[in-house]
Regions:
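Beta-sheet-dominated scaffold domains
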Residues: 1-2, 8-9, 16-25, 32-38, ...
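Catalytic phosphate/metal-binding cores of nucleic-acid and nucleotide-processing enzymes, i.e., regions
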Residues: 63
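Helix-loop-helix junctions within predominantly alpha-helical proteins
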Residues: 66-67
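Blade/loop signatures of beta-propeller domains
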Residues: 43-59, 94-100
Length: 188
């Protein structure tokens, strides 16, 4: 099963066929990640929800919790090792599968730095890089978001008129991993 979220729509691709995977009575998702057999969703109101284990079509309306360490908008969820990371506009929360019912995950840790652009989040060398709410590029190192951008990149981010539209691309070449971000009229 492959899960896709775009424009508030959740689609499951299975056997080459795409089918809607969301109940219209539930709050539309803004992103999806995979962890421990669950597809995990972010919702703009700060909720995190998930499917049944190993079943992208099974969604329990009570299987949710709130990323609420900070009263910010939930921007994106991503899976990283045994964690689901909930990127808020001003915070990041680590959630771990504890087998709870109906919601399987429990908050494990949180930091007070957020994500300015959901499309900037990318897996890089077994961690996540992203554009932070202070308009710098950061890489997670354990539970710390380490600044990796130089002043030229910081200036490009500060001058971007639509920070939320920044997107990232990663690739590997000759043993090196690259992370590039693109704004309205620039790429670094």
């Amino acid at each position: 099963q492959i899960a896709v979220v775009c424009g508030g729509q959740y689609v499951v691709i299975e056997g080459g066929v795409a089918r809607p995977g969301w109940d219209d009575d539930l709050i539309p998702p803004t992103s999806v990640a995979f962890s421990d057999g669950y597809f995990v969703f972010s919702h703009e109101d700060g909720r995190i929800s998930h499917t049944g284990n190993d079943d992208a079509h099974s969604i329990d309306g009570l299987a949710y919790s709130a990323a609420e360490i900070s009263p910010d908008k939930l921007v994106r969820v991503m899976g990283l090792q045994q964690y689901v990371l909930a990127f808020g506009a001003r915070s990041i929360e680590w959630w771990v599968d504890v087998g709870g019912d109906p919601f399987a995950f429990q908050r494990d840790f949180a930091i007070q730095i957020g994500c300015a652009a959901s499309g900037s989040c990318a897996l890089v060398n077994q961690t996540i890089a992203f554009v932070a709410d202070d308009l710098t590029v950061r890489v997670l190192n354990g539970h710390e978001a380490v600044k990796v951008s130089n002043l030229a990149v910081d200036r490009a981010l500060a001058s971007e008129g639509d920070v939320a539209s920044i997107v990232a691309k990663t690739w590997r070449s000759r043993g090196h991993i690259f992370y590039a971000i693109s704004g309205t009229d620039w790429t670094w």
